[in-house]
Regions:
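Non-heme Fe(II)-dependent double-stranded beta-helix
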Residues: 1-81, 119
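A short beta-loop-beta micro-motif enriched in histidine and acidic residues
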Residues: 42, 75-87, 141-142, 148, ...
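Short, structured patches in soluble enzyme cores that scaffold and shape functional sites
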Residues: 62, 74-76, 92-96, 108
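Short edge-strand/loop segments of extracellular domains
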Residues: 66, 107-114, 174, 180-186
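Glycine-rich, charged/polar anion/phosphate-binding loops
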Residues: 74-77, 91-92, 140-142, 161-164
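Short, conserved beta-strand element in jelly-roll/cupin
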Residues: 81-99, 147-150, 155, 180-185
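Double-stranded beta-helix
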Residues: 97-161
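Non-heme Fe(II)/2-oxoglutarate
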Residues: 121, 153-155, 159-253
Length: 253
């Protein structure tokens, strides 16, 4: 899974890139091909049927060359509509996914589960992921990991628990795209955010608004490198995350 950090790409002995690529729809040289898929008429029609909304905004995308060993999670912890629960995502198979490649999975019915999170779990990703890992240990037999073929798309709700199975054979790639869509009538945020995120820039493609990648994720500089490293470090340590949140509240007064 993308770490939101600036990293050098690591290539496996089989020639696959280990890291996922974040916001591939806003990548130079790659964006046009990806946007043709993610904003296609077929996708827009499917989104309308699933949500009942006429228009949707593309908020985030990722490309996977290899199984990135994504842990069990719910999207609404990281990005969602406000009010929560209306964002949805799609997993696009770019090749036939072999069962030993580490298939994508969902936990059917998990969108109805409302986990009570303590303060550490609300602000620190590591605590939240640990909670879901323990939950999945008791529900591993309930997961659904379909044998997706090239061109297949699996959509799920922002509350649905999902992730990827372990890779059994590293000789197999798992080329795929993931995209997150927000009905355009809703504001953008995440589950434990009190106010929507308003400083968002969009561009238009095929009648769909697409969120532009944040500059600190799009343009490399020492400043942006340090900024993302510090943020990710705090995000994995509850005490630091609490201190940071307290300082932000004091500054906002």
């Amino acid at each position: 899974q993308s770490s939101n950090r600036w990293k050098f790409n690591r290539i496996t002995s089989k020639g696959y890139c280990q890291q996922s690529f974040l916001d591939i729809h806003d990548y130079p040289e790659h964006s046009e091909l990806n946007l043709r898929i993610l904003c296609s008429e077929q996708v827009r029609t499917a989104l309308q049927e699933l949500t009942g909304a006429d228009q949707h905004n593309l908020m985030q995308s990722m490309f996977f060359d290899l199984n990135a060993a994504t842990p069990a999670h719910q999207d609404w912890y990281y990005l969602d509509s406000m009010p929560n629960g209306y964002l949805l995502a799609g997993w696009f198979a770019l090749e036939d996914i072999h069962e030993e490649a580490g298939r994508f999975y969902v936990l059917p019915g998990s969108h109805l589960i409302d986990f009570e999170l303590n303060e550490d779990e609300k602000i620190a990703n590591s605590s939240y992921v640990s909670k879901l890992k323990a939950f999945m240990a008791d529900h591993s037999e309930d997961i659904y990991a379909p044998a997706l073929k090239k061109g297949d798309v699996l959509f799920w709700n922002s509350r649905t628990i999902h992730g990827s199975l372990e890779t059994v054979n590293p000789a197999y790639s798992r080329k795929s795209l993931t995209a997150h869509y927000l009905p355009s009538s809703y504001q953008f945020g995440k589950r434990h955010q009190s106010k929507p995120k308003l400083d968002i820039e969009y561009f238009q493609y095929a009648g769909m608004k697409c969120r532009m990648a944040p500059l600190d994720h799009k343009v490399y500089s020492l400043k942006n490198y340090i900024k993302t490293e510090v943020f990710q470090f705090m995000w994995e340590h509850p005490k630091l995350a609490k201190a940071y949140s307290s300082i932000k509240r004091l500054i906002a007064r």
